[in-house]
Amino acid sequence: MASFPDCVNENEIGKAKFIGELIPPVAPFDQKSGRETWTVAFAPDGSYFAWSQGHRIVRLVPWKKCLASFSVRKEDRSSGAGPRRLSRQNSEGSLLPGEPREHTIDCGDIVWGLAFGSSVPEKQSRCVNIEWHRFKFGQDQLLLATGLNNGRIKIWDVYTGKLLLNLMDHTDIVRDLTFAPDGSLVLVSASRDKTLRVWDLKDDGNMVKVLRGHQNWVYCSAFSPDSSVLCSVGAGKAVFLWDMDKYTLIRKLEGHHNDVVCCEFSPDGALLATASYDTRVIVWDPHTATVLLELGHLFPPPSPIFAGGANDRWVRSVAFCHDGRHIASVTDDRLVRFWSIDEKSPQAIGPLTNGLCCAFSTDGSVLSAGSRDGSVHFWASPRSIASLQHLCRMTLRRVMPTQQVYTLPIPFSMQDYLAYKTL
């Protein structure tokens, strides 16, 4: 079996441009377990990059400064300089006034999930009857949520590195965290205790709702861009869509043959990508529950029985680029792949040993990927100028579900294009 179909020559696939890597400091104890980078994240405004570098530690790095350091290291490679290795101390010396600071945060337990949240003051708390709150989040507030091995969630102030809240209700590992993108500071946590919990940080972190329905571990969750729908995925081939206004299950998506471990919506909310241990990434229409595209990582495509068991092509993570046209995936075959939604073969590939997670930068220009040794690797995302047709499609689909597209008085071919049926 191979990583690419017979019609594709691996040597002809583009090579992703490697930018740099971050290496954690050497731990004071020799333990291989607990040093994994299970998650990486970029702040919504692009100001910070965060990753769990293992052994309870989360590192917050100013992204522009980090990116600039990669350029410097590239120039120094001729002199034999290695990758950037971070010290255990915060590099706060020689900072200009107002310049973002690096922070090293000891979370007290192994970190599995990370998420940035930013506040919009005019977005009211869902608990409208409560007039007094301990925390008054301003317009420039930026928070970091960390999900821990002991089931706790800790909320940190990104600018100061100080602990603000400690959320306790899960009874097992908090595997993933996601903030609503509307600035409401509504946080959803996915746990191995088979539940999703909804927290309102503007109401001092009170829990709003428990979403039940998964019969096994919940691996990941993701909000739609308008915050109205939540996708959650987990063990047992589960892909659930939830109405976040009523906190009810909308539908289940069926098509995977193994555990589903990652999910993400496209920027216009018209597409949903899910990654599974069955060697595939499936791109869905979340409005109609139909499969639009399958991105295979093992060829010939395995049978459902083989895909449902142990194989060496487990897809660990998937991420949508902010241009709405590119997807990245991390797999156990030691490759990171960059896909275009217009093609069924990778546009570019890069080497990555023991990759676990990936995320695009806010502007979509860089992909970061974490690995089992606590390091993070960065590649330049393959970019091209989007057609005006695609930009118009994204603009329209941000406000129009698939069902409404097919009521428009336009040719059927244009309806199919707007509905992404031409993928």
Curated annotation (Swiss-Prot):
* Pathway(s) of this molecule: Protein modification; protein ubiquitination
* Residues in SOCS box domain copies: 373-423
- Example GO BP: intracellular signal transduction
Alphabetically list the UniProt keywords: Repeat, Ubl conjugation pathway, WD repeat
**Stored InterPro entries:** G-protein_beta_WD-40_rep, N2O_reductase_N, SOCS_box, SOCS_box-like_dom_sf, WD40/YVTN_repeat-like_dom_sf, WD40_repeat_CS, WD40_repeat_dom_sf, WD40_rpt
Short name of one Pfam family: SOCS_box
**Domain description from the entry?**
The SOCS box domain mediates the interaction with the Elongin BC complex, an adapter module in different E3 ubiquitin ligase complexes.
Enumerate the PANTHER family for this protein: WD REPEAT AND SOCS BOX-CONTAINING PROTEIN 1 (PTHR15622:SF12), WD40 REPEAT PROTEIN (PTHR15622)
> What name does UniProt use for this protein?
WD repeat and SOCS box-containing protein 1
UniProt organism field: Danio rerio
The gene behind this protein is: wsb1
